[in-house]
Amino acid sequence: MSILRAWQYSAPQRLAGAFKLAASKSAVYRLFFGSAAYARQDAVRLSLSVRLLSWLTGAAARPLEGAAAAIRRALPGSALLGRLRRSGLDAAPPLLSGSVTARALVGLRVESCLWLVFSYILLDYALRAAPGAGSLASWWDELLLVFVLVAWPLQMALRGRITWRLTPMDLPVLLYLAVAAFLFFMRSPATNVALEGARVYAEYMLWFFVASNLLLNKNQFRALFNWLILLGTFIGIHGVYQYIIGVPIPPLWIDASEATLKTRVYSIVGSPNVLGSFLVLIIPVALSQALAAPDRLARYYYLACLTPMTASLIFTYSRGAWLAMFCAFAVYGLLYNWRLLFVLGLAAYAAPKAVPGIASRVGYLMSPAYLLSSARAGRVARWNKAIEVWQNHPLTGEGFGRYGGAVAARNIPGSNYVDNFYLKTLAETGILGLAALALLLLSGLRCALNACSRLSDPALRSLAGGIIAGLTGVLVHNGVENIFEVPMMTTYFWLLLGAVAAMPYLEE
């Protein structure tokens, strides 16, 4: 206690406090944590684009509200409702009236679909592994998104009012969609390829609006994120199991010069890099819960969840994921407690000594042999090629889906992955597309930081910091992989960003 008191009154602590106070008043702080003029509620409500959009949605909603009002007026006197009242759930047979399942079904709302979206990694694997799933395995997430976007306004209409939350992301999303539409019509040599390529960018950001509007209270929020942490724990345990048994992997996953590396884990995801990115997203969330746990038992639980996830992240041997995790921890330390940066430094120093595989992977990355190999036929060569392709059409690029990603690999002969989502975007959509995407992503981080700064609950503020750290890690990982081409990762990114935006509005 005396050491803590001495630190509180020491010159370094006072200097740190003064620096923190000055930083909170600085222009840089306002840039990241403030609210842009275009994103303030009055600016959004009075802007021409939002007024036009509100008029259009209002015109479409009026008939829906009228129909819902008629249904509400008719229901009290209906024969069906009278029959249900006479033979309601409480008057039903004991087997049914006492059924947890039956009562859960009665309480279902559109918000319940969030459990399915948060379970994306599990549902997607189950459907793809299930015999006879067919096209459902490829389209289930789109069908779920369409269902939510249709059922949500219907539910609001039946409740008597159609409304939605305005967020600082509304105008940046509209701007990006406008730029994407312009580029689509300007550069689409093959419409089917362009549609598939544009879908990678435009479709999944709709999950932002689903999360920002359907998250209603703190209990729902905490339950969903605890479930996500539990999912991450199971995935981590499975990854550790794969490492123990030495799961076989394709030879291309290991460079010929790394003979000591025998396996890389991928769990149910199918790719070590994508598994690493998923864990980068979840680990800071679990860490935030551990640090803000209300009691010792809860802290031990979250630390137990962190252990297999961290081990599995190491065993992916994904250098890009390690870099992303380092950046995510640094962001969380800056947001939650700057003293964690010292712990991060110690961990970065000790990790290569504790796990020799880390030292060999990072050491090989810095070796002349790797740089020569990468420049000849590896990642650096693909990056240079992407820049050459961009130079053919600097402003608008080659067109959506025509270079550097999964869509191009399926449809364009000779196309390879760029292993850099931003260079892929530059090659496909030019300066216009990359600038619009950069503005969108930076606006998303600013929206999240602004929401975090408005929270008064320390536990929620810590959780928001963990989510923001994970999101930042995924953005960093996109610099060396095409992470946003994976529907699961893009869905989780926009879903969690929408969740942070909703946090200041959550009810008790």
Regions inferred by a protein language model and the residue ranges of each:
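Hydrophobic, aromatic-rich transmembrane alpha-helices
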Residues: P93-A104, F118, L144-R159, I282-A293, ...
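Alpha-helical transmembrane segments of multi-pass inner-membrane proteins
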Residues: L177-F184, L206, R222-L261, S267-L335, ...
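Transmembrane alpha-helices of multi-pass inner-membrane enzymes
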Residues: F118, F147-V150, R339-L346, P458, ...
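Membrane-interface helix-loop-helix junctions at transmembrane boundaries of multi-pass membrane enzymes
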Residues: A104-E111, P153-P172, Q289-C305, G333-V343, ...
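N-terminal signal-anchor transmembrane segment
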Residues: S10, G17, S24, R30, ...
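Membrane-embedded alpha-helical segments of multi-pass membrane proteins
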Residues: A137-L154, A198-W207, L275-I283, L323-A330, ...
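Aromatic-anchored transmembrane helix interface
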Residues: W140-L143, V148, P168-A178, T191-N213, ...
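Long extracytoplasmic/lumenal interhelical loops at the membrane interface
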Residues: W253, G363-N384, E388-T429, N450, ...
